[in-house]
Amino acid sequence: MTIEVQPIREADLANLRRVSIETFEATFGPYNEEADLQQHYQRAYNVDQLRQELLTPNSRFFFAKVDGEVAGYLKTNVGDAQSEAMGTQTLEVERIYVRLKFQRQGIGTRLIKKAVQLAQAAHKSQIWLGVWENNKKAQRFYETQGFKQVGDHRFRLGKAMQRDLILMKRLNKETLN
């Protein structure tokens, strides 16, 4: 199995939207009201919103592909594109979405490695992300990747307020090895 990580282009927006909704639904659908999910999809994953994010200079998007099929994607932010003010030495992993049928095949690890490469190339010393407090599977994965909880923040999903844990990973020269 070959995992390729490729930049997402504007021509990929429909596919980006489809994968965003599919992965969000698989992860959060069983635990949330349908109306809240639909409101989130319309707000966060409409093509115009995704285009705006894709064209934001301090944001980067990458598809992970397995044998040519999109398996998931990574979205990173630096500077003023970060969803929280975490300082100038940080890179945010805003989204790391892996389709259900591709989970536990090393794709998430490959996307984290890509984020580390981007952070190091930009001379950042830390990577951070938010993960839903009830997503224990993702929390365990991030722990294995060296992330530690440093705080929390609130996340609105439709009308419901939820709590995300803020996880941080410090980088050093050996991080990529």
Give residue ranges: language-model regions.
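Conserved acetyl-CoA-binding loop-helix of GNAT-fold acetyltransferases
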Residues: 104-117, 140-144
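C-terminal "cap" of GNAT-fold acetyltransferases
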Residues: 87-91, 125-128, 132-139, 143-145, ...
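Conserved phosphate-binding and hydrolysis motifs of nucleotide-dependent enzymes
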Residues: 68, 72, 106-108, 146
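Short acidic-aromatic loop segments in the C-terminal HATPase_c
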Residues: 97, 147-148
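Extreme N-terminal starter segment of soluble prokaryotic enzymes
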Residues: 2-4
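Acetyl-CoA-dependent GNAT
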Residues: 7-13, 17-30, 38-101, 112-114, ...
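Active-site acidic-Proline motif in GNAT/NAT acetyltransferases
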Residues: 99-101, 105, 133-134
